[in-house]
């Protein structure tokens, strides 16, 4: 369980597993820092397929990620594996207006 960064030639994928809460803050930030260091021309995705719990601090981390990415010219961030409880929270919080939910 935790947060890790996957990289391909054209994008970075931050994978979150288990609970996405404040305990994941440092690991998420470290992965985000590394992903953004790769450059603004690359895509950025967050894979939430294995997330079973999502709290408000996770929503805040996603918004900070969006702001930092946008400042580097990354306009589109996809949230992958959004289903069930996780998708419901994201839609109720209107995150479907800020991110591509897949």
Place the predicted regions along the sequence by residue:
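Amphipathic alpha-helical interaction surfaces in cytosolic regulatory modules
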Residues: 19-99
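Short beta-strand/loop segment at the start of cytosolic alpha/beta domains
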Residues: 1-15
């Amino acid at each position: 369980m935790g947060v890790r960064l996957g990289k391909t030639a054209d994008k970075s994928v931050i994978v979150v597993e288990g609970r996405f809460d404040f305990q994941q803050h440092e690991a998420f930030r470290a992965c985000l820092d590394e992903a953004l260091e790769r450059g603004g021309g690359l895509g950025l995705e967050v894979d939430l397929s294995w997330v079973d719990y999502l709290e408000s601090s996770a929503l805040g981390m996603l918004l900070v990620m969006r702001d930092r990415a946008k400042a580097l010219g990354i306009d589109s961030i996809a949230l992958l594996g959004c289903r069930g409880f996780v998708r419901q929270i994201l839609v109720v919080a209107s995150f479907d207006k800020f991110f591509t939910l897949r």
